[in-house]
C-alpha cells in the first residue's frame, strides 16, 4: 500500500434515514502527503512576470513589488532557477533564466527597474514562458507569478498562453495589485493554466507576505500530477464538486459524468493539502450498510522515482430507521457545506452587481453570519441599491473564496 499520500474522507452523515425519495450525501475528501514526504524538496523554476506600466508608480506599488522580488531571490537556493520579466507596452527581460547563485547581482538588477508605459500582458507572459523553457531542469516545479495593476490589450492572447502553459506543466499564479485590474481575466488565466483564481494584493505593503506565500507554496510541493477519481455504484449520481481548500472554487460540470467524478488536483504541498466537497444524490435504499463511492487518488513522486501510484478508499453509509441516529451530522463536513453555500450565493450577488449595478438576490442570516463585518456591510449596501467601489468588490470575492481557511461553529 502506498505510504506517500493519505486519502482522508468524512461523510456528512454516517447514518441516513430510510426514505422514499433520493437524498443528498456529502463527502469531504483530503489528499494529504504523509510525514514520509517531509524532507522532499524539488528544484524551483520561477518566472516573475511583472507589470511596470505608468500606473505602477502610484502608491509605491512598483517599489513594494521590487522589495518583494528581492525577498524571493533571498529565499531561493543555488539549485533553483529564476527569471524576471517586466512588461508595459513591451516585455523586458531583467534577469534571464539562471540558477540563483548571485543574489546580490540579481537584486541590483531589480533595483534598476524603472517605470514604463502601456500594458501588454501577453508579451510579458510569452517572454516568461520562453524563459521557463530555457533549461531542462529534472523534476523542477515550473511556476509563473504574474502581477498587474490594470487592464491589458490582447486579452484573448493571454488566455491562449495560459492554456499553452498548462500543456507544458507550468502553473500561473496571477496577482492583482490595487483596484483597477481585470479580475475576470486574471481568474481565467489562473484556472486555464491548472492553478487557482487570482490573489488580491489590497495594498502595496501586502506584496511582501503574498510573494512569500507563493515561494513557500512552490517549495512545499512534494507530489505531482495528483488526480482524484470517484466511481459511483448504480443508484448514486453526482450533483456537484467543489474545491474547498486551499480556497473555494466550483469545479463545474466538466469533472462530472454519469457514474464517475474525475478531479485533477495537480501538485500536492506537504503543509497545505487540498480538499474537495462532493455532493451526491442517493436513491432510496433498504436498511443496511451501502457503499456510495470508491475514491482513488493517483499521483507521482518524481524525486524518488514513483509514477502512477494509487491509494483507494471505500466510502459507505448506513441506512436505518432510527431517527435519532440519522439526524446526527458531522460538524466539520457541514461547516464546509455552509461556507460553500455562502460562497455560491455571494458570488451570485457579485455577478449580478457587476452586470447590472444591483442585485435581486437576498442573503439569509445563515449565510451572512459566516461573513466578516466588512463583507456584510458592503453586501448590505448592494442590497439597498447603493454602489460600492471596485476595491470592495475585489475584497468581497477574495475573502469569500477563503472562508474555508478557518472553521468555526455556532456557539
Cite the ranges covered by each PLM segment.
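Short aromatic-acidic-glycine turn motif
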Residues: 95, 234-243, 302-306
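Extracellular adhesion/glycan-binding regions together with long Ser/Thr-
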Residues: 246-271
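Exposed acidic/Ser/Thr-rich ligand/metal-binding surfaces
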Residues: 2, 8-225, 286-287, 369-374
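Long, acidic serine/threonine- and proline-rich intrinsically disordered regions
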Residues: 282-411
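Solvent-exposed residues in well-ordered beta-strands and their adjoining turns
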Residues: 32-34, 231-233, 281-283, 300
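OB-fold and OB-like beta-barrel modules that bind single-stranded nucleic acids
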Residues: 28-30, 278-279, 295-297
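Low-complexity, intrinsically disordered segments enriched in Ser/Thr together with acidic residues
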Residues: 269-288
Amino acid at each position: 500500500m502506498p505510504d506517500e499520500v493519505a486519502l482522508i474522507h468524512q461523510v456528512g452523515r454516517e447514518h441516513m434515514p430510510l426514505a422514499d425519495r433520493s437524498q443528498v450525501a456529502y463527502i469531504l475528501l483530503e489528499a494529504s502527503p504523509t510525514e514520509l514526504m517531509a524532507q522532499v524538496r524539488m528544484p524551483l523554476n520561477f518566472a516573475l512576470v511583472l507589470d511596470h506600466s505608468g500606473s505602477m508608480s502610484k502608491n509605491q506599488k512598483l517599489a513594494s513589488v521590487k522589495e518583494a522580488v528581492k525577498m524571493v531571490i533571498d529565499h531561493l537556493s543555488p539549485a533553483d532557477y529564476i527569471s524576471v520579466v517586466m512588461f508595459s507596452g513591451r516585455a523586458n527581460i531583467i534577469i534571464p533564466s539562471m540558477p540563483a547563485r548571485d543574489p546580490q547581482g540579481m537584486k541590483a538588477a531589480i533595483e534598476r527597474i524603472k517605470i514604463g508605459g502601456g500594458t501588454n500582458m501577453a508579451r510579458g507572459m510569452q517572454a516568461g514562458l520562453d524563459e521557463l523553457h530555457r533549461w531542462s531542469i529534472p523534476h523542477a516545479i515550473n511556476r509563473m507569478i504574474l502581477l498587474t495593476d490594470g487592464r491589458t490589450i490582447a486579452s484573448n492572447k493571454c488566455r491562449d498562453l495560459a492554456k499553452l502553459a498548462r500543456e507544458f506543466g507550468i502553473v500561473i499564479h496571477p496577482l492583482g495589485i490595487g483596484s483597477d485590474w481585470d479580475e475576470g481575466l486574471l481568474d481565467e488565466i489562473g484556472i486555464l493554466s491548472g492553478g487557482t483564481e487570482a490573489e488580491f494584493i489590497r495594498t502595496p505593503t501586502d506584496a511582501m507576505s503574498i510573494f512569500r506565500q507563493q515561494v513557500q507554496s512552490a517549495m512545499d510541493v512534494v507530489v505531482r500530477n495528483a488526480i482524484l477519481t470517484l466511481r459511483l455504484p448504480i443508484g448514486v449520481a453526482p450533483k456537484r464538486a467543489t474545491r474547498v481548500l486551499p480556497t473555494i472554487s466550483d469545479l463545474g460540470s466538466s469533472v462530472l459524468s454519469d457514474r464517475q467524478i474525475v478531479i485533477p488536483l495537480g501538485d500536492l504541498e506537504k503543509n497545505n493539502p487540498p480538499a474537495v466537497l462532493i455532493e451526491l444524490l442517493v436513491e432510496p435504499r433498504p436498511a443496511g450498510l451501502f457503499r456510495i463511492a470508491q475514491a482513488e487518488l493517483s499521483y507521482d513522486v518524481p524525486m524518488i522515482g514513483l509514477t502512477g501510484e494509487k491509494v483507494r478508499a471505500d466510502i459507505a453509509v448506513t441506512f436505518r430507521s432510527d431517527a435519532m441516529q440519522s439526524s446526527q451530522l458531522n460538524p466539520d463536513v457541514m461547516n464546509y457545506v455552509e461556507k460553500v453555500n455562502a460562497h455560491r450565493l455571494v458570488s451570485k450577488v457579485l455577478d449580478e452587481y457587476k452586470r447590472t449595478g444591483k442585485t435581486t438576490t437576498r442573503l439569509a442570516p445563515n449565510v451572512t453570519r459566516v461573513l466578516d463585518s466588512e463583507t456584510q456591510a458592503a453586501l448590505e449596501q448592494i442590497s439597498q441599491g447603493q454602489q460600492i467601489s471596485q476595491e470592495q468588490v475585489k475584497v468581497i470575492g477574495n475573502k469569500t473564496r477563503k472562508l474555508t481557511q478557518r472553521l468555526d461553529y455556532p456557539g
